[in-house]
Structures are given as C-alpha cells and as structure tokens.
Amino acid sequence: MHDERRPQSSSGKRQRLQDTVPIEIPALDEATPPVPPAERPEMIIVTGMSGAGRSRAANALEDLDWYVVDNLPPQLLPALSGMMTTVGAGVHRLAAVVDVRSREFFSHFMDYLRKVRNNGTDVRLIFLDASDAVLVRRFESSRRPHPLQGSGSVLDGIEHERTLLGGLRGVADSVIDTSNYSVHDLARRVRELVAHESDL
C-alpha cells in the first residue's frame, strides 16, 4: 500500500495548504456566538510515518463526508477549530493531515491540541505506522526518496522520522499499523474508528 494522493475533482472537499493560502480565519477572540452543544464540531488529526497511509486514511475520511485539509501546519489547528465553533461556519467535521514536513512545530503540538479542545471541538489524533521493512519496501517500489533521508538511505530517513514522531505516537487516540493492510483494509479500519467514536 503506497501513501499516494489521489487526484481531486473540482467538486471534492479535499484542500491542500497551497490551495488555501491566504487563509482567512476569524480571530479566536472575536465576539461570535458558540455552536450549541448538540452541534459540537469534530476534528480528526491524521499524522504518522511517511509511507504508512496518511493520504489513504484521508481519502477514507473524505468518502465519509469529512472536510479534509492536507499538509496543515499544526499552529493553524486552533484557528481552524475556532472557525468551526462559530454559528454559520458550515464545517462541523474536519480532518487535518499533519506530516513531518511541519516538524519545526511539533515541539508545540500539545499546546495547539489543548487550545483546540478549549475551543469546544471534539478532537482525535490518529497515528499511522508500519514496520521499517514495510516502509522501506513501499518507498523502493514507488521509487520515491524518503522526505528526511537527505544524502542517506531510506532507512536513515525512517529512523530520523521515528525519533521526531515518537512523542505523538505515544499520545495518539488511535494507532493504526498498516504493515499488513491493503488500501481497502485501511479504509475499513478508518470507518470502524469513526463509527465507534460516533456511537459513544
């Protein structure tokens, strides 16, 4: 299973960061009425190892009618949740894909997560993982370099990424190991997680 991004039609709900700049988001201290508790918005943050299936998980969420934002810097999470909790925002279920390319912000990630929850948003963190051997095989079969390998090997990049993301994996609400998953297995697992949380 490769972590590839499928093309999006003009009617799709997928938004990449470059598609949303400049982003006009209401300031968090604006005097806007909160969303009633019965309509409390939901946010899913998708992160994890490169090649583990982040984009496939995002596709599954999009198929479940979630609004998906790709490549979101973590510091924008509180502003997005603030937008969601205002009446008339129109977005009540949002999935944000955060990857290691935003690594300079991960040291502050827990603070951003706390602010999102303080804004009145139900937030869940899903971490995608796979074994080193599987990740190496996926990168080699796709003939793409690992984003962190530099002049080293794919395995060097994977080891560096594990060091950067180890803390996030430890605090994730759900960890999905896709080592033995097909694309359909991952989509089914994401559907199960969303359905389970909705029933609680």
Predicted feature descriptions by range:
Residues 2-32, 156-200:
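C-terminal accessory "lid"/substrate-recognition subdomains
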Residues 120-166, 174, 179:
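A glycine- and Lys/Arg-enriched "phosphate-lid" helix/loop adjacent to the NTP-binding pocket
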Residues 57-58:
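Post-Walker A alpha-helix
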Residues 64, 90-93, 119-124, 170-173, ...:
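Short glycine-/polar-rich loops that comprise or flank the Walker A/P-loop
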Residues 46:
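Hydrophobic anchor at the beta1->P-loop junction of P-loop NTPases
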Residues 53:
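Conserved glycine(s) of the Walker
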Residues 50:
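The conserved Walker
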Residues 63-115:
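Conserved nucleotide-sensing/catalytic segment adjacent to the nucleotide-binding pocket
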